[in-house]
Amino acid sequence: MWNAGELASFELPLVNAEQSAQHATPDYYYRLAVRPIFKSYPIYAPGHEPAGYMDWLAQQEPALAFDASTLHSDAEWIAAGETVFDAPLGYGATFTPARVRDRDWYAHNQVPVTKDGRMPFARYVIRTKGVVDVGSGSCLMCHARVMPDGTFLKGAQGNFPSDRIVGDNLRRQAAVTNDAAALLDGVRLGQRTFFSMPWLKPDPIARVATMTIDEIASVYEAIPPGASTRVNLSLFAPAQIPDLIGVRDRRFLDHTGLVQQRSIADLMRYIAIVQGANAFDRFGEFLLVDPVPDPTKMDRYSDEQLYALGRYLYSLEPPSNPNPPNATTAADGRRVFSREGCNACHTAPLYTSNTLTPSDGFIVPGDHLKRYGIINRSVGTDPELALRTRKGTGYYKVPSLKGVWYRGPFQHAGAVRTLEEWFDPARLGRVPGHRFGLTLTPADRRALVAFIETL
């Protein structure tokens, strides 16, 4: 899976091509320890936890939950992939056992809870008998959603307020630290590690050097659930969290089309990178972690774990759509969709052409047009994510409109809360670009939204 030839070709070059990511060598990668996946248990919000639950957890023996040697049928591989999807990467960074049992924490951060009282974005894990850990960093944290009726939809664009909680955690640390200067230095260093592009002048993250903890926390807290920032993006250019339902049909991964998905192996490589292997990346002379750590002290998913996870993601199906496609308004909207030429980019049946469009300010290299499938026309949206992040290819991919009824917020940065707002010309002062549909009559606008919500 992790071989040099495929790694060299599955990503598009960055805008500054010489700064494109160089990933860990196969020799280094396969010396990383395989990440153990332990059996995990649900977390209940205050008022919903069964009596004696924590004492019961403390009596459980550690147990591994993934064993590739037992997997034979398609159903077994897919079920094992769901276990990987649920499994945390780390412990203590985002959650603590006390925090996830604190009513004030839920209220302050507006953490969604399922109808049966679970906080489903993390899990309790027993790695040592008698010690109950709260795991974080699983796929669940970003790619799962508590629906309005309290059901839980795995694979969907998430609605866990992860960045709001990062801001809250920063404020909590600042309130109790005995060394405010050291804390601030560490937080600023973390932002540079996650986001810096020192080959650009000025570095997009340079302003962090003069920001306070309060100011940094405020930026995180302003990022809405459904959007997030993570390694290689930018504190100042978050990205909409992608819906993974239907990912098997997408030619490009990431909003900037960074990764070509030619097979399940490309999806496996992509998951490996975003779930830890990006720590070993080099961008020109810039290393995220310098010096590169001893691989035997770090970990990775096994190829079998990645394959199972890929199979699970490919198996995901959308929930039943409550919006009737034959309703009069939706039928009118279908005609508006066709008349306005929306299907040129959002082409049925996937409602995406699976192509890329250049951002403002990016000149498409001649060899890209045929190699990658480019619509050589900018739609004028904010170019920051495409030009000034470590995922910046100069492009945005054409998103699929399937499943928008259960998703949101919209736009590549999650800057628009609803479809109604997207088609409201008043948004242009705050969210530029993609002017299509902004001159429709109110009736046509309502019809178009009604149709899109049936997809």
Please place each PLM-identified region on the residue numbering.
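Periplasmic c-type cytochrome electron-transfer domains
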Residues: 1-455
